């Protein structure tokens, strides 16, 4: 039977991608249905209890700048906040927060349940309704049919999921949850390229059985960083430390002795695991010369007895897990509450997606999250928001929402996936972005909030706060440019104590802040110069814009040069082997990827600037230089 109400957008899955997708579509006015196999697990952290990190924190800030939920939820559920790379430049500084799993999940659920235009329904989805290569709805496990104009699949590791502990395995989407077999079979019958990936998680330990006195405490930052542009420190619950310990040679010997029963090393698992979050058995094999590996002992919540030993993800048999855990300093009497495991699951080649995350073969069908080969809550949430927004825009018959690589890490993420695909779980790093000086955490709102407002993602309260901040920053910049200090100024004696070279001529306050030894906060302490602006976030923005103005201008020039050829078209039937000077490797990669434009060709791994120059020379020589008006969706 058909459900009585038809929807604009249906989102399948209530994880990090699904919640952001459903919330985005609903904020934009689309009548949205979120279908999940269990409402109680909406927003659940399946693996590590943390949000953010290098590259990942940037994605969370961007999700937040577009009105998403993740940053606000972690501000309400974060029990330890740190700024990583704090001693480095602003481009690579990143916020990371340890989460109380329950508080975080409750915060997400509260946001979801209070979102207008969003309906929840608990049922697994077994089938898609497809007519004339267009999705028209879904069919649930009990045969109930829901009609929709767009469908977003955010099914995580549930598609054909198989859980491995040693040589034992069973079907599962994650520990305690059933897999999605019927939907996996349905998708495999469609013309998508499909493969298998693997991820894993460590055993959870009972904190009462650990000796924290022999471990190194790792406190959070003080004052605590705030994740959301709408957040504040008053939201944060009680803050507690994490701890650090290490594996040792005995640990490694135990692991080596169990490799003959490892599903990874005996070929039982065929899927490729995450390169940047390897299992402990992978680490001791790949880095055989290392005598120890660091373990971050992370509490799972303020009222939880469980801790997450970050760094010893494993799918070894339980007896080996027990022995390796108890060989670690502080874990000698550890009780394992939940065994570690690996999970193998289906993912679909993201090169079969448009930049909107709509599939190329089925109109109105969008994929987001681990189904596209990514790993991590943050990568999933970013894709979910973009997919949900584009699903709503398609229903509303409006232009798609596509972010360029120079506009957002979201743009880098989706362009990497859609252009190059992935053979292993894809994780975001700042190093993946060519223009990371422009794509900082601190300016995510100035890059994206106005764009979000234009398409309906950003509400009135966020828009008002954003405009207040931007006005404060601009007003202060104008003041600093217009206020001058000369050698006889009343502030000069105090100022000279802060400077390497004393004031010998007239300087604007802006020029003084540009000096390496001077900061905005220091300068504002001088009575006749300060007090400046109270908001530390706006003050940081003022200082960064002044100190990095030259570097930012140069990067903007680079972008302008690149964009001159970004949309230069490559003929669909182009024979790359005829281009003199291209290596066989480059020819093979271009032939396989068939990039539509010079811009897309330049982002294929292994395609050098020299190869791009040869392509442009060839196009010009043969009168083939043409540009497309708009990047294809």
Curated annotation (Swiss-Prot):
Subunit-structure text: Homodimer. Heterotetramer of two MnmE and two MnmG subunits.
Functional note: NAD-binding protein involved in the addition of a carboxymethylaminomethyl (cmnm) group at the wobble position (U34) of certain tRNAs, forming tRNA-cmnm(5)s(2)U34.
Domain of life of the native organism: Bacteria
Family annotation (Pfam families): GIDA, GIDA_C_1st, SAM_GIDA_C
The UniProt record lists the keyword Flavoprotein: yes
Swiss-Prot/TrEMBL cofactor(s): FAD
Gene Ontology molecular function: flavin adenine dinucleotide binding
Gene3D superfamilies per record: FAD/NAD(P)-binding domain (3.50.50.60), GidA associated domain, C-terminal subdomain (1.10.150.570), tRNA uridine 5-carboxymethylaminomethyl modification enzyme MnmG/GidA (1.10.10.1800)
Cellular component annotations (GO), alphabetically ordered: cytosol
Family of this protein: Belongs to the MnmG family.
InterPro entries registered for this protein in UniProt: FAD/NAD-bd_sf, GIDA_C_N, MnmG, MnmG-rel, MnmG-rel_CS, MnmG_C, MnmG_C_subdom, MnmG_C_subdom_sf
Descriptive protein name: tRNA uridine 5-carboxymethylaminomethyl modification enzyme MnmG
Subcellular location per the Swiss-Prot or TrEMBL entry: Cytoplasm
PROSITE patterns linked: GIDA_1, GIDA_2
NCBIfam families on file: mnmG_gidA
Assigned keywords, A-Z: Cytoplasm, FAD, Flavoprotein, NAD, tRNA processing
Organism lineage: Bacteria, Pseudomonadati, Pseudomonadota, Gammaproteobacteria, Alteromonadales
Binding of FAD, residues: 13-18, 125, 180, 370
Binding site for NAD(+): 273-287
Alphabetical GO biological process terms: tRNA methylation; tRNA wobble uridine modification
Organism from which the protein derives: Alteromonas mediterranea (strain DSM 17117 / CIP 110805 / LMG 28347 / Deep ecotype)
């Amino acid at each position: 039977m058909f459900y009585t109400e038809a929807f604009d957008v249906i989102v399948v899955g209530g994880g990090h991608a699904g919640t952001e997708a459903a919330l985005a579509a609903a904020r934009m006015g689309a009548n949205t249905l979120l279908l999940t196999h269990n409402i109680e697990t909406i927003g659940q952290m399946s693996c590590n209890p943390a949000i953010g990190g290098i590259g990942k924190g940037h994605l969370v800030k961007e999700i937040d700048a577009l009105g998403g939920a993740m940053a606000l939820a972690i501000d309400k559920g974060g029990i330890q906040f740190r700024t990583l790379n704090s001693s480095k430049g602003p481009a690579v500084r990143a916020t990371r927060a340890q989460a109380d799993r329950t508080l975080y999940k409750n915060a997400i659920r509260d946001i979801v349940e209070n979102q207008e235009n969003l309906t929840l329904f608990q049922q697994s989805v077994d089938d898609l309704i497809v007519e004339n290569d267009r999705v028209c709805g879904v069919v649930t496990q009990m045969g109930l049919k829901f009609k929709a104009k767009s469908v977003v699949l955010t099914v995580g590791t549930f598609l054909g999921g198989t859980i491995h502990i040693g040589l034992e395995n069973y079907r599962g989407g994650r520990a305690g949850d059933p897999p999605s077999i019927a939907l996996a079979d349905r998708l495999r019958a469609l013309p998508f390229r499909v493969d298998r990936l693997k991820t894993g998680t460590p055993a959870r330990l009972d904190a009462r059985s650990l000796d924290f006195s022999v471990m190194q405490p790792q406190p959070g930052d003080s004052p605590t960083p705030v994740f959301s542009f709408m957040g504040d420190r008053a939201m944060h619950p009680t803050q507690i430390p994490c701890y650090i310990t290490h594996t040792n040679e005995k640990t490694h010997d135990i692991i080596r002795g169990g490799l003959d029963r490892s599903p990874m090393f005996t070929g039982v698992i065929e899927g490729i695991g995450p390169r940047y979050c390897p299992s402990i058995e992978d680490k001791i094999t790949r880095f055989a010369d290392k005598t120890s590996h660091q373990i971050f002992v992370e509490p799972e919540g303020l009222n939880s007895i469980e801790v997450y030993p970050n760094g010893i993800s494993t799918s070894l048999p339980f007896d080996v897990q027990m022995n390796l855990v108890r060989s670690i300093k502080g874990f000698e009497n550890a009780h394992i509450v939940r065994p570690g495991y690996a999970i193998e699951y289906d993912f679909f080649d993201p090169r079969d997606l448009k930049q909107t995350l709509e599939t190329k073969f089925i109109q109105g069908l969008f994929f987001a999250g681990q189904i596209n080969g990514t790993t991590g809550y943050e990568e999933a949430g970013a894709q979910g928001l973009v997919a949900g927004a584009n699903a709503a825009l398609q229903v509303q018959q409006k232009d798609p929402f596509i972010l360029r690589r120079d506009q957002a890490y979201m743009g880098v993420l989706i362009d990497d996936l859609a252009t190059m695909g992935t053979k292993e779980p894809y994780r975001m790093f700042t190093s993946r972005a060519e223009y990371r000086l422009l794509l900082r955490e601190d300016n995510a709102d100035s890059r994206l909030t106005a764009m979000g407002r234009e398409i309906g993602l950003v509400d009135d309260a966020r828009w008002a706060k954003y405009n207040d901040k931007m006005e404060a920053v601009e007003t202060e910049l104008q003041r600093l440019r217009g206020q001058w200090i000369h050698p006889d100024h009343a502030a000069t004696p105090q100022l000279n104590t802060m400077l390497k070279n004393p004031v010998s001529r007239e300087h604007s306050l802006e020029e003084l802040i540009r000096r390496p030894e001077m900061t905005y906060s220091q300068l504002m302490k001088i009575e006749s110069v300060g007090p400046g602006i109270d908001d530390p976030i706006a003050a940081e923005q003022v200082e960064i814009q002044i100190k990095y103005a030259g570097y930012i201008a140069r990067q903007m020039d680079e972008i302008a040069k690149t964009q001159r050829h970004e949309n230069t078209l490559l003929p669909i039937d182009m024979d790359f082997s005829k281009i003199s000077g291209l290596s066989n490797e480059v020819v093979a990669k271009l032939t396989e990827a068939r990039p539509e434009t010079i811009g897309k060709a330049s982002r294929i791994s292994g395609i050098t600037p020299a190869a791009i120059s040869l392509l442009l020379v060839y196009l010009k020589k043969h009168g083939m230089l043409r540009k497309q008006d708009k990047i294809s969706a």
